[in-house]
Amino acid sequence: MKDPLKDTRPRLRPFRYAVVALTALVVLSLGFALIPGEKPAPAEPPFSERARAAALAEALDLRAAGMQLASTGAADPAVLDPVVTLLTIQARALLSPAAGSAPATALASASPSSTAPPISAAGFVQAMAGSGTARVRDAETADGGVARLLAGTGAAQLLAAGRLATALGVPTPEPAANSEMTSSGPATTVPCPAPSGQASGPATAPVGGGAGLPADTRHALASAVSAEQQAVYGYQAALPRLAPAQAGPASEFLARHKELAAAAEERLRLACGTPVPQQPGYVLDPGFLAAPAVNLGRLEAAAATSYGDLVAVSQGQDRAWAVSALQAAADRAVRWGVDPGPVPGLALDVSQLPALPGDAGRTGGAGPSTAPGPATGAGLPTGGLPKTPAAS
């Protein structure tokens, strides 16, 4: 008689193997499903956001350093307080629209700390100039409104560094390599579209220009032409009323405005824009001739705003040229004793800017309720040209 165990075991063994294999497969599949995959690395923020964040961090660092210098008596607080106010307004302007978006490390550095390494007055001036140069450089690449904000921030920091060096008696920072002369190279050109019914002529436009160049860019170029034409007219009207010590610089500035007007007209032509006719005259502000110096400064500040508009809507060589022209206009405004504001080229309503976190009650924290405008002298001593005697 056959043993039943010997007959059934061989048949059960494959079945057991199948059960074990199926169980292992289920366990493995559940394990892969429960173990989350690695999250992809976050995408790098766009250049404009990185440039804005860097500008904010440096403004806060400089602000903290200025407060430290003033608190330790290493420099005259009366000289440093306007700079701290300037940096405070700039930092508030650089904050992202989203509340609390400033980097935590940057905001933490805004408060002077006993553990922070001391900085000398000369080092502070050099750091301010370095930050201004970096902002101007980034403005040539950043997008639209951020570019305008960076250009104005950098221009104001460079001006403040120069004036602060004079006030503190420390070496003046070396001028940035970027200037009107080095930034005004011509754009690569392509033929402009010919008017309907006419053969295509030799006129040229920048690559991406002509019909492809945004209308707001051509409009901003036309506005720059108008601003320069008005500046030329203003200088011609003011020259006979200026003191001899002011007439020399005014003549140089007049020549520069004529060059800028011609350059703006050429860029507008290359952009296939409609030429701006030369006006026979302009209506000057009441009292312009009675106080020609300060009113020339206001004209320069207005020109800076026109170039700020162009910075926001242009690219490439036009952008670089506009950034440089904005800097120069702000500098000339200061030469005439007019403060172009904390962000030249951009009208700021400081009351609408977000407050810096943790700034309540801090000296220099909130800044003035309104930004120093083109017609005011708030801020560092301008060290302008000699005053003009009252016109008879």
Q: What is the predicted function of each stretch?
A:
Residues K2-S392:
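All-alpha RGS (Regulator of G-protein Signaling) helical domain and cognate RGS-like helical scaffolds
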